[in-house]
Every structure is written in C-alpha cells, then in structure tokens.
C-alpha cells in the first residue's frame, strides 16, 4: 500500500512539472505514449496525423513496452496513455477498445509445411512452436493458447519473446510455427516470407485498448491527442476497426 501511494505521489509531481511548462496559448506540451509492440491501426495513425497538423509545436514520444509495462506506466502517470492488450481491468484506470485483430498461425520458408495447400489442423500436430510470453492459459493471449492446443501442437514452445518483431523473426527463421495478427503478417505472406497455416476460420479475436489514468492531470497536448482517439472510437463502428 505504501509503495502504491509513493508511486501515486511521484506521478503527481511529474505531472505538475509538466503542466507548469505550459504558459503559452499555443499547445506545446509533450505526449508520451506507451504501446505494445507492432500496433498496426489506421485509426491510431490518422489520429497522430491530425494531432500534429493541429498542434505542430507539440511533441510526441512512443515507447514500445509489454502490455503489462505499458499499463504500469499509465498507473504511475509516467505515460500519457497506453495502447495495449488488457488482461484484468484496474478500476482506477479507463479503457476503450481501439481495434480488434485476429491471430493466425504461420511458418517460415524453411519449415516443412511452407507452401503446402489443403492443410488441416491435424497436419500441425507434433510441430514445435514459438510464441509470445503471454501465450498461456492464465494470461492475455489465452485464446491463442487454445488455438495451438486445438491443433495438438502441445506445450513444446522452443522460443518466446514479448515483442512481435522477435516472434516474427523466429517464425521466418524456421524455429517453429507461431502466432501473429493476420493483418500484420499479410505483407510478409505476400512477400513469401511467411505461410498462413490452419485454422483459416474462427481464429481467436484479440482486442487492443487505449488505457489512461483519469486521476492524472494531463497537459493540453495530452488532452488533445486523447480526444483525437476518443472521437474516432466513438464515431467509427467497431466493424471498421476490425482487422484480419
């Protein structure tokens, strides 16, 4: 409890220092965004474009973290907001679903299943896999764990990472079959670097959220950037924010 209070006080001091820098009418504040690795979302990109056009003197920094670290940064008020996966909701934070993605299984060019058609889940049985550190029954990628289990791939995970780019690297290197968001992997599929494996329907849905701390005193740049995102979330149907 004492530690949480100390983190809260430290965050408040950090926020006060940031707010005191804003003494002009023009928005010049800094926005620090914590994102999970490889967030591919046109809605987010459009919000960034519009924000910069409106406030060219405001600055941005985007830190790539695990989803857990991103949420911790928001809790500690050291990040303006986060874009990440959510396992359990903290009642002290606010959450809005930014987009939905679907995960599929992929292999690289040197894998024996690469390039083969008419495959079924049974063809994946016994093959080793690589995955994310959160690909566990008790964690945020539980649906992906169940997808691997349905293919009878077992628990033989020979490589893990918390970053999508490194999971992708291991898949392309032929270390094992691995999960990736379908819309993120499509470019590599088109380039002949990845091969999409079964299942091809009923793939696991994963929601990516915007997370912020309502107790944090945001500067005007942070407020504006958050409003850019919220406005799009409220007006664009989830069907148009679903990728895969």
Per-region residue spans from a language model:
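Central regulatory/effector-binding core of bacterial HTH transcription factors
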Residues: 28-91, 244
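Beta-alpha-beta core module
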Residues: 90-97, 101, 166-215
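Short amphipathic alpha-helical coupling segments at ligand-binding clamshell hinges
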Residues: 1-5, 43, 47, 120, ...
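Alpha-helical "hinge/linker" immediately C-terminal to small N-terminal DNA-binding modules
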Residues: 1-22, 231-234
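Secondary-structure junction motif
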Residues: 121, 127-152, 218-220, 226, ...
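A local structural motif
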Residues: 54-62, 148-158, 193
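A late-sequence structural motif
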Residues: 43, 195-239, 243-244
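Flexible hinge/capping segments at coil-to-helix
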Residues: 24, 93-132
């Amino acid at each position: 409890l004492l530690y949480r209070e100390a983190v809260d006080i430290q965050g408040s001091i950090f926020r006060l220092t940031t707010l005191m820098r804003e003494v002009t009418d023009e928005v010049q504040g800094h926005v620090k965004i914590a994102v999970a690795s490889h967030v591919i979302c046109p809605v987010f990109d459009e919000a960034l474009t519009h924000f910069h056009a409106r406030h060219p003197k405001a600055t941005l920094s985007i830190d790539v973290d695990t989803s857990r670290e991103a949420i911790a940064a928001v809790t500690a008020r050291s990040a303006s907001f986060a874009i990440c996966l959510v396992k359990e909701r903290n009642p002290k934070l606010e959450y809005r679903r930014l987009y939905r993605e679907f995960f599929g299984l992929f292999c690289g060019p040197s894998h024996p299943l690469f390039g083969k058609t008419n495959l079924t889940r049974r063809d994946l049985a016994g093959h080793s896999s690589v995955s994310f550190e959160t690909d566990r029954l008790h964690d945020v990628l539980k649906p992906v764990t169940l997808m691997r289990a349905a293919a009878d791939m077992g628990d033989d995970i020979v490589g893990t990472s918390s970053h999508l780019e490194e999971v992708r690297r291991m898949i392309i290197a032929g270390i094992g079959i691995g999960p990736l968001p379908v819309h993120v992997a499509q470019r590599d599929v088109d380039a002949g670097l990845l091969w999409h494996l079964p299942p091809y329907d009923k793939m696991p849905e994963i929601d990516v959220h915007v997370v912020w701390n309502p107790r944090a005193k945001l500067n005007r740049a942070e407020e504006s950037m958050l409003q850019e995102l919220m406005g799009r979330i409220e007006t664009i149907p989830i069907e148009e924010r679903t990728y895969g």
